[in-house]
């Protein structure tokens, strides 16, 4: 699949900095707000293929974090989807990847799961 896309002039970039012009397609796992800002700053065309469920989780995490809640995200911390949700929540978030990690958290009243 990647080869056939490459034959059409479509490639994978690890950073928006690799692009000077053209169109960026965001995959279904989504990305954090800094990527959207970089795309806009460079004047690149955007095709956002973020899954609607992921987008909803991102926006919910952002809203709750902006309201002062601490957001707990359950999942693998290095999974792209989890990383993107955490980036939207910012510093007011925590990723839990196992039951053991969950058992070691001291919950306070403004944490949202």
Regions picked out by a protein language model, each given a short descriptive name:
Residues 1-113:
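The feature marks the mature, well-folded catalytic cores of soluble enzymes
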């Amino acid at each position: 699949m990647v080869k056939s896309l490459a034959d059409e002039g479509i490639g994978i970039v690890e950073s928006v900095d690799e692009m000077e012009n053209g169109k960026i397609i965001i995959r279904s796992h989504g990305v954090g707000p800094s990527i959207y800002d970089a795309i806009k700053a460079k004047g690149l065309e955007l095709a956002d293929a973020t899954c609607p469920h992921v987008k909803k989780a991102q926006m919910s995490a952002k809203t709750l974090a902006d309201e002062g809640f601490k957001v707990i995200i359950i999942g693998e911390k290095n999974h792209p989807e989890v990383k993107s949700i955490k980036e939207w929540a910012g510093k007011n978030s925590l990723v839990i990847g196992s039951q053991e990690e969950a058992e070691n958290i001291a919950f306070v009243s403004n944490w949202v799961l």
